[in-house]
């Protein structure tokens, strides 16, 4: 059995739930945050647009940077070959848009396969900031207690695969998951949040980022992504950044309106 999770933070809990032996042979981590950036070529190696997005978004001061040019196409090839092998697949997911997109992506990869697809829902079903839960947000003991695998029905598989096709075609740069469906948008709403919470006086960039991260339902806004948007706004003259990047690429930075 393959067990697929979105991001390294989910590994400890899922490992405790399925056991170390099963994790050693079947746990695979897909690290791409599918909720942000262009998805048009994410399934088509060499995934040039997807790679270019992450290479631009990754803070230069945080090294070593992931090898996006090899890792993202490798994920695409692995998923494309998933239907060719014999092991059934389980996707662990919560209320993260990225986790839900992974589930839809896997359903699409297995759309014409008789291979069994299972899911372990770990969320609340509500993607609002105050109620949402990603897999990694559960303590390992709690995750093991709530994990109830269930096979994905044929009709649900078809619906998920159709959602994935729609996401690839909508050219959205951000995808929110709300009420069981995805909606695509550009970066304007996130950028507007950053400008709304910025002031004429300098403040820690970390504080501004936290404000934007705390007021966005539908997807988990990561520090990597919102830092990139702040850098882009600074390059356009809308924000002014000062100081040295420091830890995580932003802890030493101050920000004010441009």
Pin down the residues of each PLM region.
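C-terminal, charge/polar-rich interaction regions
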Residues: 171-258
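A short acidic (Asp/Glu
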Residues: 12-17, 39-40, 99-106, 128-131
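A structured, charge-rich N-terminal accessory region that forms the first stable segment of a protein
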Residues: 1-70
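Short coil/turn segments at beta-strand junctions that form active-site/ligand-binding loops
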Residues: 1, 25, 85-88, 115
């Amino acid at each position: 059995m393959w067990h697929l999770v979105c991001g390294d933070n989910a590994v400890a809990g899922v490992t405790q739930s399925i056991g170390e032996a099963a994790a050693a042979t079947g746990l695979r981590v897909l690290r791409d945050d599918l909720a942000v950036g262009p998805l048009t070529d994410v399934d088509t190696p060499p995934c040039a647009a997807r790679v270019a997005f992450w290479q631009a978004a990754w803070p230069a001061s945080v090294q070593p940077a992931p090898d996006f040019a090899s890792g993202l196409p490798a994920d695409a090839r692995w998923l494309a070959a998933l239907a060719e092998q014999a092991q059934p697949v389980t996707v662990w997911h919560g209320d993260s848009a990225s986790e839900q997109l992974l589930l839809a992506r896997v359903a699409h990869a297995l759309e014409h396969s008789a291979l069994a697809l299972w899911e372990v829902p770990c969320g609340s079903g509500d993607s609002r900031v105050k109620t949402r839960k990603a897999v990694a947000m559960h303590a390992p003991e709690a995750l093991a207690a709530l994990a109830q695998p269930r096979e994905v029905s044929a009709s649900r598989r078809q619906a998920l695969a159709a959602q994935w096709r729609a996401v690839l075609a909508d050219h959205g740069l951000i995808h929110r998951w709300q009420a069981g469906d995805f909606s695509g948008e550009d970066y304007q709403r996130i950028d507007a949040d950053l400008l709304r919470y910025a002031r004429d006086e300098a403040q820690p960039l970390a504080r501004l980022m936290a404000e934007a991260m705390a007021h966005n339902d539908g997807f988990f806004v990561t520090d990597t992504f919102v830092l990139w948007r702040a850098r882009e706004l600074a390059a356009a003259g809308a924000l002014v950044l000062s100081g040295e990047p420091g830890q995580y690429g932003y802890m030493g930075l101050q920000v004010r309106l441009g």
